[in-house]
Amino acid sequence: LAELGADTYNIIQVFFETKTKTYAALERLALDSMRMYFSDRCALICITQDMYKRSGSDESETDRIANLPRQIEGVLVGITMRELKDGSYKASVRTHGEIGASSICKRLGGGGHMGAAGCTLYGSKQQAINSLLKEVQAELDSVTID
């Protein structure tokens, strides 16, 4: 595109650096919900339907949020849970190193690959979190962490 005269600066700005106001509001609420587990090796965000309402956002704006928990220094497992309209929870798991996101999610009926995977959880928010944390603990215990 650059060779054809496209304004690459503006393209990058629009596609990679610009956030909608509703996304920024949702991101703030999501980060405020973050909890750390297992000596800060796991960070978990839970986005609720109420957060969508409060931010004016919707599920279409959550893809970039899925990577935020893993970006924190020292975090090996980053989880973003989204409450769906039916009350279930979609979990996106992102991992570093030898920690297998797919191993965590497969045990919960989901799938993916080593560094990124997902699953759907049923029950209350706390039940969903507890199910995820049980599998994260099992995965952390199964690998040697330097």
State each model region's role.
Residues 1-107, 112-146:
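Hydrophobic helix-and-loop "lid/oligomerization" segment in the mid-to-C-terminal part
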